[in-house]
């Protein structure tokens, strides 16, 4: 499984990458905004996207429909610190939601 991490905070990207790689999951890349995200997919592939709901240049509710149209097989899991976002994320087309406060093992499940 190839995973792409999209988060504007370098420390969050590094922590997620470390947790995933310790479990033998291949992190194909990481990006900090939606422009980088869309550019990355022009030359790369991923099976799963861990997407920060609040990227600085385009929120998840706008970027998920674009990704769904271009990459229908891509699984999208939204990361956010607010539980209220769960309903919005699923309505926008996300496959799942993980709170940034959840234990890392929850992400792996």
Task: Indicate residue ranges for each PLM-predicted region.
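Active-site residues of response regulator receiver
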Residues: 52-53
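Short amphipathic alpha-helix used as the core "switch/output" element in two-component signaling
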Residues: 61-72
């Amino acid at each position: 499984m190839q995973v792409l991490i999209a988060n504007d905070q370098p420390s969050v990207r590094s922590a997620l990458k470390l947790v995933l790689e310790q479990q033998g999951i291949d992190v194909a890349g990481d990006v900090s905004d939606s422009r980088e995200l869309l550019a990355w997919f022009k030359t790369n592939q991923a099976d799963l996207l861990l997407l920060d709901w609040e990227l600085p240049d385009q929120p998840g509710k706008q970027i998920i429909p674009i990704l769904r149209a271009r990459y229908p097989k891509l699984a999208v899991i939204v990361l956010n610190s607010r539980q209220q976002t769960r309903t919005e994320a699923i309505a926008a087309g996300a496959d799942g939601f993980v709170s940034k406060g959840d234990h890392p093992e929850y992400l792996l499940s």
